[in-house]
Amino acid sequence: MEQGQNKPDEIFSCTRIAEFQNYLHQEERSRNTITKYIRDLKVFFTFLDGQPMDKEALLDWKKHLTQTHAPASVNSMLASVNKFLDWLELPGLKVKPLKIQRQIFSNPKKELTTEEYRRLIKAAENRLLLQTICSTGIRVSELKFITAESAKTGRAEADCKGKTRIIFLPPDLCRALRHYCRERGIDAGIIFCTRNGCPLDRSNIWKDMKMLCDSAGVEPGKVFPHNLRHLFARTYYALEKDLSRLADLLGHSNVSTTRIYTMESGLMHSRQLSRMGLVFTRT
């Protein structure tokens, strides 16, 4: 084979990945989901490096992933390849995910507190953007549905992941959004967008939030857009103790997913144990 020519297996993988990507589009999967699947598949085919795609190769890849990735990441990547194998009608090649014990407590190094959130808001140039995400619990991908019209009605209709749901906007937020729109001459359409009028994406917001860490005095590991959604969930659950209604507000079809969002670091449990006063020995 001449230099520069692709090997047959490389042509196969590229062609099949492209066809699979088209299939995901037809399934109306979200852009982020499709990007994730395709990225994982490319990693898998790079690992194969021309080897036959058989059960042994899949098990080798799983073993390799366990040595280089966290268990949750391993399962996520295996799920991408298993989806591809289902599409190829090769279910016999699918590999089982790792068994992970359900976490009861969250990592305290990633739990954003209300006080830390206040400091981020104080340090932010566009404070209303962060408050909009945190006070509604929306995904960053749903920010484009927060419009001048929704600021007037107090609700936005979001079409995400093939499902339509209603996002409720608190009255205080609506007033702030309407004032924001008046100042910027926004009469209709998306409120938070780029200079070109395109919706802000996760990378835009992630970068801006990371720049606030030093001035706000908050650990970088706690500062990312999705953590605002987690803070919303924990705050709501602490007030209402209604997991089912919280699932509706977050747009979850499975309450088990919602339960993950309400996990605490365990610091409160530790304080409660300390108040019991059952240790008398002092050092």
Model-predicted regions and their roles:
Residues 1-283:
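Conserved catalytic core of the tyrosine transesterase superfamily
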